[in-house]
Amino acid sequence: MSLILSNVILHKLVKNEQDELEVCLRNQLLENEEFTEALVSELHRVFNSKAGKGFGIFKTESEFGHWLGSVRKNETPFLEFSNKSAEKLKSELIKYPFAEEGILVIAEYQSLATEYLFVAVLPSNESMKVTDELNISATDYLDIAKMDIAARIDLSTWETDSDSNRYLTFIKGRVGRKVSDFFLDFLQADVGMDTKVQNQVLMQAVEDFCADERLEKEEKQQYRKQVYDYCNGQLQAGEELTVKELSGELPTSESGSNFYQFAEEQGYELEESFPVDRTALRKLTKFVGAGGGLSLNFDAMLLGERVFYDPETDTLTIKGTPPNLKDQLTRRLGSSES
């Protein structure tokens, strides 16, 4: 991956003897050399591969946004911007119970004609290494794969499209809303495009289109499968789905309208493109549910053929039990009768 580096800096978040978080500031930018480019390239790659990212936009009063704008206009040196950002990050981080030590990296770079600003707190872990004398000693390393406090601003979009609701991307993190809340507070940003909602609206639009066109059951299943195949292909490739491109993959109705026109006319307010949500996608081809000690998962095409649901009695009937399940049930019933 070829990147063009503009500015890269590292600062360190450490805890003092009183277990209070402090910032150790680096006094100059990193040199634009091989290791610096390798670091930023890996950060860019890992960030792209992270699932569950959220989108945001700067609030009007965002200090971080104003500082960044000043840097982009060459009114403020990048080093000064990074120092102020590091201090602000610390002041926000100490409000949360997950405040930990780490390496703050702030990088301004270009990839594929798009300019970015990347901000992340990287875990610094200890490991072992073998020296040239074949002795064992301790060494520290950056655990980039485990980063969950990170955000990236698409500078090109931010500066050219004031109506964009997704130029800021952040990792939501595995510890729930707290990490994303903290980073949004630090950046003084609001949540922008909701990927999950966009996917849910898309799936509902697909169902409504099938109903509006009065497709037969088999036609509906085929239509859903084509939607699934396209979206899953984009997901596997790490690409976003494009509504117009998806529509082009689907057959035009007998009335001559296509899915894209339908979605536009019915006012679903879908973005032109957005990331695929795996959970929403799965519901196109499967019914999944769990609760009360019961877990069910079956292909949607089986509903009405081998699986029947009666809403009045809230009863699900399955005809043709899977062989391995049938064997378990038979053995259990047999042992209870003996």
UniProtKB/Swiss-Prot annotation:
HAMAP family in the cross-refs: NdpA (MF_00730)
Molecular function GO terms recorded: double-stranded DNA binding; single-stranded RNA binding
Region annotated Disordered, chain positions: 319-338
Keywords on record: Cytoplasm
One GO cellular component term: cytoplasm
Subcellular location(s) of the protein: Cytoplasm, Nucleoid
Organism: Aliivibrio salmonicida (strain LFI1238) (Vibrio salmonicida (strain LFI1238))
Domain of life of the source: Bacteria
Transmembrane spans: none
Family named by the database record: Belongs to the YejK family.
Organism lineage: Bacteria, Pseudomonadati, Pseudomonadota, Gammaproteobacteria, Vibrionales
Cited Pfam families: NA37 (PF04245)
Stated name of the protein: Nucleoid-associated protein VSAL_I1059
PANTHER family: NUCLEOID-ASSOCIATED PROTEIN YEJK, PTHR38772
Keyword Cytoplasm: yes
InterPro entries attached to this UniProt entry: Nucleoid_associated_NdpA (IPR007358)
